[in-house]
Amino acid sequence: MEFNIEQRNGNLNISIIGAVDNENAEELKNQFQELLNLGFKEAVFDLSFVPFITSSGIGKFLIFYKNVISQGKKMRIKGINENLLELFKSIKLDQLFPIEK
């Protein structure tokens, strides 16, 4: 799993490349902790190159979302594939934050 991070116009654009699984969930948590220390209005995750996410990975996204909201910031996901979109909708994540294909 790789992270590409870019700050632009108050937004934090984060591209994740590779599967988010149990093996790298701790790395994801650490990356998210670092992101929270950056100044931004909205975190935008591009998941175009993420084939799948395990429940551990989803849990890390939820913790990050909770922290982002508590700081008065926003979060959104874009570039999600059809399988992940169905998964996110089935657990109602689309009701927490915007998800775009």
Question: What are the language-model segments listed below?
Answer:
Residues M1-S15:
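Short beta-strand/loop segment at the start of cytosolic alpha/beta domains
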Residues P98-K101:
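Short acidic-hydrophobic, aromatic-tinged amphipathic segments that line or gate anion-handling sites
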Residues N22-F32, L36-L96:
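Amphipathic alpha-helical interaction surfaces in cytosolic regulatory modules
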